[in-house]
Amino acid sequence: MSLLKERKPKKPHYIPRPPGKPFKYKCFQCPFTCNEKSHLFNHMKYGLCKNSITLVSEQDRIPKCPKSSSLDPKQTHQPEPTSKPATSKSLLNGLSSFDPKSQQGSAKEDAKENLEMQARGAHKGPQKPALQKEMAPEAILSTQPCLDSGVRHSAFVPVGEHRLRGPEDTEATEVLANSTTKASSFHAKSAFHTPGYPWKAGSPFLPPDFPHKISSTKGFGAISPYMHPAIPEYPHPFYAEHGLAAIYSPYLLTGNTPECETTLLSVYGTQDQRHFLSPAGPIPKHLNTSPSTYDHYRFFQQYHSNLPIPYGFYRPESAFPSYSLRLPSVTGITRDQSSRLLEDATLAYPASSPSELNLSSSHRKHTECEKGSPVPEAKDPSKDGQRDAEEAKMSPRAGSAATGSPGRPSPTNFTQTSQTFEGLCDLSNKAASSGTLERLQQAEQSPTAFKPVQRGSESPHSQPPANRTESPKSLQAMNGDPPAQTGSSNSFITEAPPSSPEDHSRIGPLNLSKKLETNPAATYGPMYASNAQADTLQDLPLNLSVKDLCNAWAPRPALPGPPQGAEPAATPKTETKGSEDRTSRVETPQDKAHSRTTPDVHTEDSSDEQKQTAAVALCQLAAYSPGNVRVADEEGTVQEPTRQDVPTLSATENLEAQCDLRPKGQKRTSQRDTGKSQQGTKKPKLNDPVPRVLTLRRRTRVS
């Protein structure tokens, strides 16, 4: 075995299987076949595809005839079940002048030869001379005078011909030698093609066909006859494999066959997917020509899932443009046919146009989802609008557990919350009357992040629908007069869980632990809810997004006095809770929420500061590092030197609140954190004038 020098595997790995038996394993990029995985493994390991390809391609033409003739007597009678159909079909085209006997024999032999050449591609080189010597006698054995293919230069003649033409045997070898030189020049290319071919389809018998087609060069001696059969023959498997026939062939084949042929060859040679798009050139013209092609594409949408790669590749370039063109014009049809596409697309699209697409499709989703709930939806148009807003807000939550990603936190919810705070207020108003239900929800909150929302929307069951109609009024009242504000703020406190899922979605990307889901969102939920009214007016929920940390931190110095005064009231509670943090998690949100009740009362006076406190609360969650929080707190204290006692308390309170939250996110013991943060906050209170510098120093120390 001459090739043994190049590689280590033992000869048995490359002993061809007896040609009649089907092979279990086939190299996916060259004609090698075998029945043992280890053989194939070695073949791949030592990268012998090149060997087998070159051997099959170039040495195929020389030893192929002799080899088949050498093994002829034994092989001709072993049926080749697997590859015979393919080769015999192709041979029947070429061998139409053969008599049936010779057709069958040569087909079988060709198939066997191919398989053997594939399997034996590795050690065929040394056998060449011997096989050529054997060729004359055995070919004489199988002489069939009917095959004077001096007349016929079919693609398949040479294979059978040299085998079956005994007397002209010597001439056959000469022809083979000549054509081998010529064809090897071409076949360098085709050997290169051959790997690509199985690559594309993996159909094991295309390479076998291929050597026959090449062998046509043997008989004919010229390359052009080979090239011509190649183009009619390749396109069929090529198209059929890739499903291009369905899509491209009408255009390609109708338009310009010469160009089509050249592109086919190039595609075939390079096996580069980008070339698949080059044949697609005609299609864009078609698309532009007539509007009916939109119907054509609409027609294809149903199939595009099953269609093979080239259509998938092509679709982004033309079909999606057509999508965007059609979204306005043909919306009805698009929604009917590709509603699934659109609703899936809502995940991709919201970034670009969340308001449109999300609202449309997620409304659809949620209306379907919540139609089941017997809430009297049509009681009031404003109620309906709010309900829709709720649904729009919740739809991402219902659809996917965690909307958004750390890099880009759920644009869907940010845009929607600006439009759906009415929904929030509606929810909270309902919640005011059904507080017990909300307690239940708070208990349920940890296992089900989404249920509270549904519950919140169902709470009207326990409540006359009049309350729902109230909600717009109460919206104005919240913005207008403090008494209504206090009432609704209490409702917000109970309502923390229902509003919290939406807050989760804001905080979602940051707090990935379940524990955090219950507490922080419920903690800051009330603030959001209470600020919802002011936010609806100014669309500021967007500024609460994690992206806007800078904007949110900056306003912190303007912290209102009242909120800070109110927070110390809860300081003892939260401090005790700090230690029991993990046990009483549900209470903590409520206590903290109550601690913020007073800020809620002041919303209409200091709605801006309230917004900022909400923002700061969120940002404290977002930026876990205690240093950042302290920066904000100290800025606040600098700006309010008169209230130094209260700021100290409230800052420590804030930090403790955050330490209560942080341990859940960061698995630290709340005691230690609280101690650290208290140290951190109390120090700069002593040196008030230079809080910034100390903050920087302490930030490194604590974090």
Swiss-Prot record:
Where in the cell?
Answer: Nucleus
Q: Where is the composition biased (Polar residues)?
A: 67-106, 410-421, 456-477, 639-655
Q: Which GO terms describe its biological process?
A: cell differentiation; epidermis development; establishment of skin barrier; membrane biogenesis; negative regulation of epithelial to mesenchymal transition; positive regulation of ceramide biosynthetic process; positive regulation of gene expression; positive regulation of transcription by RNA polymerase II
Q: Where is the composition biased (Low complexity)?
A: 352-361
Q: Locations of Basic and acidic residues compositional bias? A: 367-394, 574-611
Organism superkingdom: Eukaryota
Which Pfam family is one of those matched by this entry? zf-C2H2_7
* Region annotation Disordered: where it falls in the sequence: 64-113, 350-527, 553-614, 630-703
Listed InterPro entries: ZNF750 (IPR039363), ZNF750_Znf (IPR039064)
Going by the UniProt record, its keywords in alphabetical order are: Activator, Differentiation, Metal-binding, Nucleus, Transcription, Transcription regulation, Zinc, Zinc-finger
Q: What is its main location?
A: nucleus
Q: Which GO terms describe its cellular component?
A: nucleus
Query: What are the protein's GO molecular function terms?
Result: DNA-binding transcription activator activity, RNA polymerase II-specific; DNA-binding transcription repressor activity, RNA polymerase II-specific; promoter-specific chromatin binding; RNA polymerase II cis-regulatory region sequence-specific DNA binding; zinc ion binding
- Residues that coordinate or bind Zn(2+): 27, 30, 43, 49
Per UniProt, the CCHC-type Zn-finger stretches lie at 25-51
The UniProt function text for this chain reads: Transcription factor involved in epidermis differentiation. Required for terminal epidermal differentiation: acts downstream of p63/TP63 and activates expression of late epidermal differentiation genes. Specifically binds to the promoter of KLF4 and promotes its expression.
Write down the PANTHER family for this protein, in alphabetical order: PROLINE-RICH PROTEIN 35-RELATED, ZINC FINGER PROTEIN 750
Q: What is this protein called?
A: Zinc finger protein 750
The organism encoding this protein is Mus musculus (Mouse)
